[in-house]
Amino acid sequence: MLLPYLNKDLIEAGCDEAGRGCLAGSVYAAAVILPVDFKNELLNDSKQLTEHQRYALREIVEREALAWAVGVVTPEEIDEINILNASFLAMHRAVDQLKIRPQHLLIDGNRFKKYQDLPHTTVVKGDGKYLSIAAASILAKTYRDDYMNELHKEYPFYDWNSNKGYPTKKHRAAIREHGTTPYHRMTFNLLGTDPQLEIPF
């Protein structure tokens, strides 16, 4: 069972992103404030769940959270400010939209750019440790998956309904054959041939 909070006396928002390592598409982030007594034994890191479980849990989170929101940063913005800053910006945009102002942010990962005057704590593999971060990971993942499924209808060659924009062999083969789209991140190592273009984390 994941932990319900880091500090019971503060309004905490868990934050996570999806799509950082993709070659195409926006990066999504979510922020979620759960009730302190929220319990769900299935809720875990979205990568550990089936697609069906993720969407079922999304409904529960949206229904039972005190507040939740999703932030998006486009491929053009990613190319302009780099993917790490874009991930932070997506989280900031999600927090911006929360109908309740949190007093503390729980961030998945080991780095974060401070949001206004709010204190934050970074938690490595936080989506497997805290309920609010796990909930945010599910919202970010499912909303981004919905977006990539829509893009797939426009550009079916790239298999985005399956790979969601990640660098699979089929995705890179399609880039070689058909070129790039307006949704590809042009600063990324799209063909996997130039290691100097990889962005270090």
From Swiss-Prot:
One of its GO terms (molecular function) is manganese ion binding. It is found in: Cytoplasm. Its main location: cytoplasm. A divalent metal cation binds at residues 16-17, 108. Its EC number is 3.1.26.4. Its cofactor is Mn(2+); Mg(2+). InterPro entries: RNase_HII, RNase_HII/HIII, RNase_HII/HIII_dom, RNaseH-like_sf, RNaseH_sf. Manganese or magnesium. Binds 1 divalent metal ion per monomer in the absence of substrate. May bind a second metal ion after substrate binding. One of its GO terms (biological process) is DNA replication, removal of RNA primer. The keyword Manganese applies. The keyword Manganese applies. Residues 10-200 form the RNase H type-2 domain. It catalyses: Endonucleolytic cleavage to 5'-phosphomonoester. Belongs to the RNase HII family. NCBIfam families: PRK00015.1-3. This is Ribonuclease HII. It comes from Phocaeicola vulgatus (strain ATCC 8482 / DSM 1447 / JCM 5826 / CCUG 4940 / NBRC 14291 / NCTC 11154) (Bacteroides vulgatus). The gene is rnhB.
